[in-house]
Amino acid sequence: MRTAIIAGNWKMNKTVKEAVELVKELKPLVKDAKCDVVVCPTYVCLPAVLEEVKGSNIKVGAQNMHFEESGAYTGEIAPKMLEELGVHYVIIGHSERRQYFNETDETVNKKVKKAFEHNLIPIVCCGESLEEREGNITEKVLEGQIKVGLKELSKEQVEKLVIAYEPIWAIGTGKTATDEQANETIGYIRTVVKDMYGESVADKVRIQYGGSVKPGTIKAQMAKEEIDGALVGGASLKAKDFAAIVNY
C-alpha cells in the first residue's frame, strides 16, 4: 500500500515572516494527517520554515536545485546546501522551470541523480501542453520525459522518488482534467516506470496529481486507484485550504 503524499509548492510567494505564520497556523490543522505532508517554500524561507516545523509531522522541500556540487553558477543553489539545512524533498522539472528557465529532460535527470547523492527525495514533474494534448501525443510526450528523466537510476532510488503529473493544459486555461483522465494518465506513467524498472518498483512509486488541486476536488481525485497524492499550488498558500486538502 502506497502512503499518499501531499506537497504544497509555494512558488515565488511568502516572505520569511509570512512563511513562518503560515506554518504555525498549519501545524495543528494537519497533525493527524494520514498522508505525508510537505511544504516547499522559497530558498530564503527554508531555514525559518525548517525551524518552525521541528517536532511536527510536516516535512520541507525545496523548489529546485542545481546539478553541480558548487561553482560559477550565479543565483543557483547546490544540493549539499539543501542537505545541510535538513531539507527532505526537492521539486525537479516543474513545468514553470521547463517553460521559463530552459529545464530539459536531460537536466532533470542530472538533478535527480544528484538529489539522491545528497539524501534528497526528488519530486519529479512531468506533463503535456494543450497543443500536445490536442495533438493526441500525451503518451509519447510523457514517455519521453520519464524515460530520460528517470534513466540510469537504481531500483531502490526509483521506489523512493515521487512523480508529479501536471497537465500543463489544465493549469490556468479554464480547461480541467477529469478525475478519470488524471487517473488514466497517471496509470500510463506507472506503466512506463514498469517497462523501465519492473512491476514491483512501479507498484511502489508514488505519483501525484498537480493540475489546479483545490479542497473541493481532492476527495474524488484521491479516491482514484492510481493517484497517490497532490502537488498543490495556489491552495497551499492558505493554511485552512491546504489543511482541507491534506485531510481529504
Swiss-Prot record:
It catalyses: D-glyceraldehyde 3-phosphate = dihydroxyacetone phosphate. GO terms for cellular component: cytosol. Homodimer. Its EC number is 5.3.1.1. InterPro entries: Aldolase_TIM, TIM_sf, TrioseP_Isoase_bac/euk, Triosephosphate_isomerase, Triosephosphate_isomerase_AS. This is Triosephosphate isomerase. NCBIfam families: tim. GO terms for molecular function: triose-phosphate isomerase activity. The gene is tpiA. Involved in the gluconeogenesis. Catalyzes stereospecifically the conversion of dihydroxyacetone phosphate (DHAP) to D-glyceraldehyde-3-phosphate (G3P). Substrate binds at N9, W10, K11, G172, S212, G233, G234. It is found in: Cytoplasm. SUPFAM superfamilies: Triosephosphate isomerase (TIM) (SSF51351).
